[in-house]
């Protein structure tokens, strides 16, 4: 075997051993080689399976298939027999194709980014009963297997002795439940060693060396039971103290249960009775101390009364027990001069040292700095520059790649108009604030406050300060509801369009009903079908019922239909249940994140695309379904794009599965070519000709141009309603106010104009008014976001005003930041908007941009979310499904390589991936929870720290987009109410205060209304919390409270969001992120706004006018090294840190002069 083949063979052994360790807990390369040898001796998969079972290897069928496939893919090709094992898995792409340009590009990318082309593995998560029924079923199964192995051990033939020897050596490293004999032998060894050493000890000493046995393994470290003590003495070896060199993703990589080890005591916490140990400072063969200088330093005592060590430097700083509890008694740590004064008083006998706990806590230990984590000294931390092993040399290459262009022409007229629109919006906001301030000052001038102060007989309550009266006037002024909103609210509450037709007549009146027979024939003849139908044609509500009536729900199968939004899944399920004549959850149900309304009777199931993706994690073949419908596929969410690739392979493995992809836009040809050129079934909609008009010159202020166009249509055009597309709530509210004032100025000389806003924050009863017809002789104008492009069908619209902009979120992988920016729409969106005018009759579309801009500055189709969003959660799900080769995964539009590299780096930093890019045990736990990886890590860590009760509430509140209600007309009053719940150090704890107070008030809606909190959001948070508690119970995670020890909560947050850390830069007046050194700012709505917090973590970064940090909390920088020792490190005190290198020395100058006025180059030279 030459060197290359030998390296390939070693890689194969490592992969197989990793799979065995993840599946059984056994870490043994010899066992892996033995299984590879069995595979080589087998002619097919069945023979290989029988050989393994005959040797006592009781593995699941899917696990053996995975091992077989790994051997076939990685083993040197010359060594694999031509008729070797076939694991039964079909190729996702079917027949092989000739290399084309796309294949050449993929080969080039595979060379550049080998970390993105790791071989796939079989989905082992689906074999874990924890995901389908109960987490304890797996443990019971393992226990049964262990008993069977012990009973059959003595009756095996001689040829099995090799494997038996391996098992007997390794059973001690799995868990106590696998073998009682191994535990007895370990105990016997320890007793014999104790008796040979002499008398038993009472307690360990600091920096002492002891032998012990590993008694427990957790994600954060290993527990060791020390030998030679009268009472059982346990200590914790943190994961950072196990191995001297290299990074450990999990302690099980270096130690195993029952393993004898040598440890060194590095810290003793007498109050909490906890001992911190270290293995890396002890030679594990001889027991020799590798750091003896530490012991000598600890023995040097001072000659003073308090016996302070002369060299009390903490050489083990940062290695703190994760289970350590923080005291929150609010005591202030004494400064050095105060301590010196107390020492002198105690030495003179004036006071007793025992009466001063601060003095005792700080100086009655051998290492004061270690006991007090809240040191006053300035802590400098740095990033570790080591790259993950599987991404070595790839991270810097990815940063040089150009990102996906969200804007086609950055210098075009549309881009300039978008930037100008932001400036004008800020100007309008400042004008409103100045007007409110001016009116409050005018109210002040009408009152004479001096009279009540001069009159000695006046009531003290009448004596007011000018600032209080000014604030009260401003609150009263802003608390008044605008006239346009009052006109909207004064109307009768509506719950949608009323009809006198029966349910049957309504169904038969839909366009899809006429094509029922043709549609069912197309489904029966084709496995995959693309369905093209306009919004309102009935495709979402009717085709599921047609399929159920045709018999596709027989044999206990279901019809699944995905929706891009959870609100759509709930509302459609309720409508279909009403048409079927059942309750939601019976024959018709829905499943969204944290809510499942299905039962054994369910035949039609609506769900979000993310929930179907999680079902693919458990059951890749989707055996419960006979038909899968991907509805609203044109929206191209991240989950929908992932489902495209997954289901494209599933239909090849399941010929009986039907796949229907629906779209409301004209891009069905692309879907058809992607899904093996499947046929397209078109449902003709109600469409009429639309006249499209462009502007001759680009508009500088698109908002003002839109409002002028609305008034022009209202005054000069015929009857018909108007639909205006704007970008967000602020623009819509401003437009409604301006239109109302203009129509009010014209008085009764013009017909009535009903102004109706539509955006997600509005109550549903107000949104429903858009479906009601306009009053006789009047006209309604609907001002909406892009939700009205495809998701809504409004009758009576004859005129559409399209400024050509949309607000969308874009992820920057370099900064790890989401930017909410206004961008030009695509040509497909422009066509969709103009089509809204031709649903009822011939209409007109006013495009407020030039025809040249439409052709040259707009992209043909919108950028899919998968190319502009953070992919950490998506890649974690794909890894859990066994999909490691991200470059060869069949994406319709592949995401940028730098976005995938950034996601892999993030998962590696969270310890969800190991050095080979495969899932760790912690990563598998994180995949169990339907939330972002950071939140999953925070929740798992909170269980270990004992604050999971509070963390569940915080995570539930974070899952709601925004719980605060801040109407523009009552902003100051809303801010005043919000300040009642503020925690001065944390937005996260502020959310916890809101939830706790809401529960104390019995979840009252009136309480929410009084405190400007969205009751619907609070109820949603409560539902999320209940579902999370069910998941915690399923996986046997305890839910415990930390009481008043709120530092534990902040530390748990650090464990997941340590990459989102920023430090205050006093020179530039902002914060700098530690990872990228990018300037970011505190959002004005946060409790830390205007405060001098030094170190903070943030939940997310959103770019609007600036890069703002949202949901921020203060942290101790030492926690960062403790929770992420492989990501952060303390800066070398003997060298200048990178942070200090970036600091600038700014000289003092006259504050009345301009900056840099002191420079010689800025001085004007006088003439002679």
Swiss-Prot record:
Molecular-function GO terms, alphabetical: ATP binding; ATP hydrolysis activity; RNA binding; RNA helicase activity
Motif DEAH box location, chain numbering: 631-634
Segments forming domain S1 motif: 207-280
Compositional bias segments (type: Low complexity): 84-94, 184-197
Main location: nucleus
Annotated residues for binding of ATP: 533-540
InterPro entries, per database record: DEAD-box_helicase_OB_fold, DEAD/DEAH_box_helicase_dom, DHX8/Prp22_DEXHc, DHX8_GH2-like, DNA/RNA_helicase_DEAH_CS, HA2_WH, Helicase-assoc_dom, Helicase_ATP-bd
Broad class of enzyme this protein falls into: hydrolase
SUPFAM superfamilies the UniProt entry points to: Nucleic acid-binding proteins (SSF50249), P-loop containing nucleoside triphosphate hydrolases (SSF52540)
Domain (Helicase C-terminal): residue spans on this chain: 702-882
Region described as Disordered: 77-100, 144-197, 287-314
Keywords: ATP-binding, Helicase, Hydrolase, mRNA processing, mRNA splicing, Nucleotide-binding, Nucleus
GO biological process annotation, one example: mRNA splicing, via spliceosome
Superkingdom of the source species: Eukaryota
Domain Helicase ATP-binding: from-to ranges: 520-684
Bias (Basic and acidic residues) ranges: 149-173
GO cellular component: catalytic step 2 spliceosome; nucleus; post-mRNA release spliceosomal complex; spliceosomal complex; U2-type spliceosomal complex
UniProt subcellular location: Nucleus
PANTHER family, sorted: ATP-DEPENDENT RNA HELICASE, ATP-DEPENDENT RNA HELICASE DHX8
Family named by the database record: Belongs to the DEAD box helicase family. DEAH subfamily. DDX8/PRP22 sub-subfamily.
Record note on quaternary structure: Belongs to the 40S cdc5-associated complex (or cwf complex), a spliceosome sub-complex reminiscent of a late-stage spliceosome composed of the U2, U5 and U6 snRNAs and at least brr2, cdc5, cwf2/prp3, cwf3/syf1, cwf4/syf3, cwf5/ecm2, spp42/cwf6, cwf7/spf27, cwf8, cwf9, cwf10, cwf11, cwf12, prp45/cwf13, cwf14, cwf15, cwf16, cwf17, cwf18, cwf19, cwf20, cwf21, cwf22, cwf23, cwf24, cwf25, cwf26, cyp7/cwf27, cwf28, cwf29/ist3, lea1, msl1, prp5/cwf1, prp10, prp12/sap130, prp17, prp22, sap61, sap62, sap114, sap145, slu7, smb1, smd1, smd3, smf1, smg1 and syf2.
Role, per record: Acts late in the splicing of pre-mRNA. Required for the splicing of introns with a branch nucleotide to 3'-splice site distance greater or equal to 15. Mediates the release of the spliced mRNA from spliceosomes.
Name this polypeptide is given: Pre-mRNA-splicing factor ATP-dependent RNA helicase prp22
Source organism: Schizosaccharomyces pombe (strain 972 / ATCC 24843)
Gene of this entry: prp22
């Amino acid at each position: 075997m030459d060197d290359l083949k030998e390296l390939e063979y070693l890689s194969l052994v490592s992969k197989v051993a990793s799979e065995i360790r993840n599946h059984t807990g056994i870490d043994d390369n010899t066992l892996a080689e033995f299984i590879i040898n069995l595979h080589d001796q087998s002619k097919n998969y069945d023979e290989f399976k029988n050989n393994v079972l005959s040797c006592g290897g009781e593995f699941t069928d899917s696990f053996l298939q995975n091992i077989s496939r790994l051997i076939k893919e990685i083993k040197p090709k010359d060594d694999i027999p031509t008729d070797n094992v076939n694991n039964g898995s079909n190729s996702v792409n079917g027949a092989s194709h000739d290399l084309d340009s796309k294949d050449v590009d993929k080969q080039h990318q595979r060379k550049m980014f080998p970390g993105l082309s790791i071989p796939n593995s079989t989905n082992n998560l689906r074999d874990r009963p924890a995901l389908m029924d109960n987490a304890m079923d797996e443990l019971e199964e393992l226990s049964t297997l262990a008993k069977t192995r012990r009973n059959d051990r003595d009756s095996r033939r001689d040829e099995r002795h090799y494997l038996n020897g391996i098992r007997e050596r390794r059973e001690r490293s799995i868990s106590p439940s696998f073998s009682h004999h191994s535990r007895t032998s370990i105990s016997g060894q320890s007793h014999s060693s104790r008796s040979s050493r002499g008398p038993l000890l009472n307690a360990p000493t600091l920096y002492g060396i002891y032998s012990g046995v590993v008694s427990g393994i957790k994600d954060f470290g290993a527990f060791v039971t020390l030998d030679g003590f009268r009472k059982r003495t346990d200590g914790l070896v943190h994961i950072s103290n196990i191995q001297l060199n290299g990074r450990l993703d999990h302690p099980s990589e270096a130690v195993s249960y029952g393993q004898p080890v040598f440890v060194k005591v590095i810290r003793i916490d007498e109050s909490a009775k906890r001992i911190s140990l270290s293995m890396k400072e002890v030679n594990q063969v001889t027991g020799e101390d590798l750091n003896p200088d530490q012991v000598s330093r600890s023995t040097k005592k001072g000659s003073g009364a308090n016996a302070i060590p002369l060299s009390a430097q903490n050489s083990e700083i940062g290695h703190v027990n994760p289970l350590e509890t923080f005291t929150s008694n609010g005591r202030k740590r004494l400064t050095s001069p105060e301590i010196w004064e107390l020492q002198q008083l105690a030495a003179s006998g004036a006071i007793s040292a025992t009466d001063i706990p601060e003095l005792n806590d700080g100086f009655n230990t051998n290492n004061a700095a270690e006991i007090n984590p809240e040191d006053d000294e300035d802590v400098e931390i740095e990033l570790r520059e080591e790259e993950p092993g599987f991404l070595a040399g790839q991270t810097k290459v990815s940063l040089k790649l150009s990102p996906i262009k969200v804007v086609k022409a950055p210098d075009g007229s549309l881009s300039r108009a978008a930037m100008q629109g932001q400036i004008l919006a800020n100007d309008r906001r400042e004008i409103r604030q100045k007007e409110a301030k001016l009116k409050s000052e005018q109210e002040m001038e009408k009152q004479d406050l001096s009279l009540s102060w001069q009159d000695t007989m006046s009531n003290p309550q009448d004596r007011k300060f000018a600032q209080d009266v000014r604030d009260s006037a401003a609150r009263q002024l802003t608390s008044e509801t605008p006239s346009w909103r009052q006109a909207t609210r004064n109307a009768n509450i509506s719950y949608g369009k009323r009809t006198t037709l029966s349910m049957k007549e309504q169904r038969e009146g839909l366009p899809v009903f006429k094509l029922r027979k043709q549609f069912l024939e197309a489904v029966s003849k084709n496995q995959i079908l693309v369905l093209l139908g306009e919004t309102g044609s009935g495709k979402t509500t009717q085709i599921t019922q047609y399929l159920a009536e045709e018999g596709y729900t027989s044999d206990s199968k279901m019809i699944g239909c995905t929706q891009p939004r959870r609100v759509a899944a709930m509302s459609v399920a309720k409508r279909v249940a009403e048409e079927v004549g059942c309750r939601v959850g019976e024959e018709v149900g829905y499943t969204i994140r944290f809510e499942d309304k299905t039962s054994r009777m369910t035949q039609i199931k609506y769900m979000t695309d993310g929930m179907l993706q999680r079902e693919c994690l458990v059951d890749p073949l989707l055996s419960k379904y006979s038909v899968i419908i991907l509805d609203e596929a044109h929206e191209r969410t991240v989950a929908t794009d992932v489902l495209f690739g997954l289901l494209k392979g599933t239909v090849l493995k399941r010929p009986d599965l039907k796949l229907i992809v629906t779209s409301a836009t004209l891009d069905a040809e692309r879907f058809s070519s992607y899904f093996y050129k499947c046929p397209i079934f078109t449902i003709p909609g109600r469409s009429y000709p639309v006249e499209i008009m462009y502007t001759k010159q680009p508009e500088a202020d698109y908002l003002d141009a839109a409002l002028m166009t609305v008034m022009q249509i209202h005054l000069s055009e015929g009857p018909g309603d108007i639909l205006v597309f704007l970008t967000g709530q602020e623009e819509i509210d401003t437009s409604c106010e301006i239109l109302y004032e203009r129509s009010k100025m014209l008085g009764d000389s013009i017909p009535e104009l009903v102004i109706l806003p539509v955006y997600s924050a509005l109550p549903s009863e107000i949104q429903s008014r858009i479906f009601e017809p306009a009053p006789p002789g009047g006209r309604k104008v609907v001002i909406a976001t892009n939700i009205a492009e495809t998701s809504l069908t409004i009758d009576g619209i004859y005129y559409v005003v399209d400024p050509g902009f949309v607000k969308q979120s874009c992820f920057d992988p370099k900064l790890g930041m989401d930017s909410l920016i206004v961008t030009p729409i695509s040509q497909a969106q422009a066509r969709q908007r103009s089509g809204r005018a031709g649903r009822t009759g011939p209409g007109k579309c006013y495009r407020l941009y030039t025809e040249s801009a439409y052709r040259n500055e707009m992209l043909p189709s919108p950028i899919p979310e998968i190319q502009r969003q953070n992919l950490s959660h998506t890649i974690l799900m794909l890894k859990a499904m066994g999909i490691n080769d991200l470059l060869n995964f069949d994406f319709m539009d592949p995401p940028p390589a730098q976005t995938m590299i950034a996601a892999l780096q993030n998962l590696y930093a969270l310890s969800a991936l190991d050095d080979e890019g495969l899932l760790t045990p912690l990563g598998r736990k994180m995949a169990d929870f339907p939330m972002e990886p950071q939140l999953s890590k925070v929740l798992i860590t909170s269980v270990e720290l004992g604050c999971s009760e509070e963390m569940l509430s915080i995570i539930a509140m974070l899952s709601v987009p925004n719980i605060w209600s801040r109407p523009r007309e009552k902003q100051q009053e809303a801010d005043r109410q919000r300040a009642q719940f503020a925690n001065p150090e944390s937005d996260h704890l502020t959310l916890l205060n809101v939830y706790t107070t809401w529960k104390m008030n019995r979840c009252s809606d009136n309480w929410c209304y009084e405190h400007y909190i969205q009751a619907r959001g609070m109820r949603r948070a409560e539902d999320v919390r209940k579902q999370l508690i069910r998941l915690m119970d399923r996986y046997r995670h305890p839910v415990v409270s930390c009481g008043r020890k709120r530092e534990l909560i902040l530390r748990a947050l650090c464990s997941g969001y340590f990459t989102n850390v920023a430090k205050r830069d006093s020179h530039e007046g902002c914060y700098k992120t530690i990872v990228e050194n990018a300037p970011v700012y505190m959002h004005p709505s946060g409790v830390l706004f205007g405060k001098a917090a030094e170190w903070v973590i943030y939940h997310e970064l959103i770019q609007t006018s600036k890069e703002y940090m949202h949901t921020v909390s203060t942290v101790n920088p030492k926690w960062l090294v403790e929770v992420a020792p492989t990501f952060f490190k303390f800066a070398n005190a003997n060298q200048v840190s990178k942070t200090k290198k970036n600091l600038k020395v700014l000289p003092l100058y006259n504050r009345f002069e301009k900056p840099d006025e002191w420079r010689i180059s800025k001085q004007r030279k006088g003439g002679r």
